[in-house]
Regions:
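Residues at the N-terminus of the alpha-helix immediately C-terminal to the conserved SAM/SAH-binding loop
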Residues: 108-111, 245, 295
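Helix N-cap / loop-to-helix initiation motif
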Residues: 81, 245, 304-305
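Intrinsic disorder at enzyme termini
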Residues: 2-30, 311, 325-383
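Ferredoxin-type iron-sulfur electron-transfer modules in oxidoreductases and energy-metabolism complexes
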Residues: 209-236, 252-359
Length: 383
């Protein structure tokens, strides 16, 4: 891995590691789910089934949502990338002669570069006339064509719901199939994102109930469909953006946000960024893990993040996306470790060969992997 992104990532990581020690403990994480639910593991399983049901039929479900939302009096815009979104949004604002909008911070807004784009279009982002608001709901609801939103304050809710032109932006994976599923998903989101047992202030918006205003929703892909082709990797799209995985990740809590140089950070970024952006620039993130499994254990929708990082490594190797040096090293190690003849040799000899395979710079601050004194094969022969 000899890319500019990888070198920058390493430089930031080294600076962070020098400042604080690495620990894999997450005993201080206050998991309220055990006090809210009698069986939190069952609830997590139910939530993962809800997300899987939508993602496995995402194309059909999104078309149903479009039909329902349109029937309710709203307008749906499809956007493949953030460029498509910005172009469509600019055209919509120009058509309605909007010179100022109310925007609200969200990671998706940052991903799309919304504030920067509006500034370039000379559109103010703090309106006082109540004409237009741009907001990201938490979930779309397929069977009713509605949008479920959580607000930070009653004032924010009043601004959004009171605007004459309501513009909602939502990634294509943040939907549930029916309104009954909102209860579980919103409670889990509140617990794992905000450490509260229920959302502070929420609303379900259906265009038909606001006939005095225009409602538009932008369904935005922005790389998410790249991951749908793999039945294994598509599990990452179950994510509800709670960030619980970050709080328990020893690597993230050591290096922080800065090395990623992206709106996506932490274990989730390690899995999806190579697909959302490009393999060459972000494949190194899939090796950015100690394999402790904390992120997998804490995830409220049971995304196997640790397994997906390992699956990414296998995918890169099989598709020959690895750098030549790394590919040769992996091939040699694989051949060595799968050889019965080699594994039956004495421990000190195997240890010495590993040192030959792995550069001394890698082993500078860590011990050489240790082999057991006797292999399973040797034990079986003795018996």
């Amino acid at each position: 891995m000899n890319t500019k992104e990888y070198k920058t990532f390493l430089s930031y990581c080294k600076a962070s590691i020098d400042e604080k020690p690495l620990t894999i403990s997450f005993d201080d994480f206050d998991d309220l789910s055990h006090s809210v639910f009698s069986n939190p593991h069952k609830i997590k399983q139910k939530a993962s089934e809800i997300r899987k049901k939508f993602i496995d039929n995402i194309d059909e479900n999104l078309l149903i949502f479009e039909r329902k939302f349109t029937e309710n009096g709203g307008k749906v815009h499809w956007c493949v990338s953030y460029d498509d979104f910005i172009d469509s949004l600019s055209a919509l604002l120009a058509k309605n002669k909007i010179k100022a909008v109310n925007t609200f911070f969200s990671r998706f807004n940052t991903e799309l570069g919304l504030e920067f784009s509006l500034k370039n279009e000379k559109i103010a982002t703090l309106a006082t006339d109540g004409k237009c608001a741009i907001f990201e709901p938490e979930f779309g609801i397929v069977n009713t064509g509605s949008l479920f939103s959580i607000f930070n304050s009653a004032y924010d809710m009043e601004i959004v719901m009171g605007s004459k032109l309501k513009i909602f932006i939502i990634p294509i994976n943040k939907f549930v199939c029916n309104i009954a599923e909102i209860d579980i998903m919103s409670t889990l989101l509140s617990i794992y994102r905000n450490q509260n047992d229920s959302p502070f202030l929420s609303s379900i918006f259906t265009p038909n109930s606001h006939k005095d205003s225009a409602s538009h929703v932008f369904l935005i892909d922005n790389g998410r469909s790249n991951i749908l082709a793999s039945k294994t990797h598509r599990k990452a799209l179950w994510c509800i953006d709670c960030d619980a995985c970050k709080r328990v990740c020893p690597v993230f809590n050591t290096i922080g946000d800065k090395p990623y140089n992206n709106v996506f950070t932490g274990p989730y970024a390690n899995v999806v960024l190579p697909f959302y952006e490009n393999f060459d620039s972000y494949k190194h993130l899939s090796f950015n893990s100690v394999g402790c499994g904390n992120c997998t254990r804490v995830c409220p929708v049971n995304i196997p993040l640790t397994d997906l990082m390992i699956e990414n490594r296998r995918f890169f190797f099989e598709k020959k996306i690895m750098d030549l040096g790394d590919e040769l090293l992996c091939s040699r190690l694989k051949k060595f470790l799968l050889s019965r003849r080699e594994m039956n040799k004495k421990t000190w000899l195997k240890r010495r060969k590993i040192k030959v395979f792995i550069k001394s710079s890698v082993l500078k601050n860590r011990n050489t992997p240790a082999f057991a004194k006797q292999s399973f094969n040797g034990l079986k022969i003795q018996k």
